[in-house]
Amino acid sequence: GGQSLNTCPCMDDMKDTQHTFAVDFETYYDKSCSIKTLGTLGYFSHPEFDAYRVSVVGDEGTSFVGHPKDFDWPKLEGHIILSHNASFDETLFIYGVKKGWWPGFTWAEWHCTADLAAYCGLPRSLKGSTAEVFNLEISKETRNTMMGKRWESMSEEFQKGVDAYALKDSELCLR
């Protein structure tokens, strides 16, 4: 077959390149609406539950933080996904697709970096593994302060802090 004048042959190769993306959801929680007391599906189906933020960072330059319905999920089609505690993020993603909260896509693989850290003999928590591997201390104070707070009731300053926190978690997960 002939070569199209409108495309560079190198662009065909780029279409087939597999990338890796870190995905991290931020969700509402309080004492009664909690994964610890309700389990995963009980938590997701609780009337107070809200997945109000997702951060997605890719090795090809993607850096997104915002409401999950605003992310271009099909962009991740066929790629590798990482989450630090994938049993939460992957299950929430699938649950959200089934509920019509956001569109689905088919990923190549979805790996848990928390499980990987534990397998390698590192602390399972992102905070612990980041400290040990990268000699980097990260604060989980923002996450602790998010308890019982709805996105719409947070101050603009606190929302910016939540977004920065979420983005940092995905950046470290990808790292």
Residue locations for each model-derived region?
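N-terminal accessory regions of nucleic-acid-interacting proteins
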Residues: G2-S32
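Ser/Thr-glycine-rich phosphate-binding loops at phosphate-binding pockets of nucleotides
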Residues: F25-K31, G42-F44, N85
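Cytochrome P450 core scaffold surrounding the K-helix E-X-X-R motif
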Residues: K31-S34, V65
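Active-site-proximal helix-loop-helix substrate-binding element of RNase H-like nuclease domains
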Residues: H46-P68, W73, G78-R175
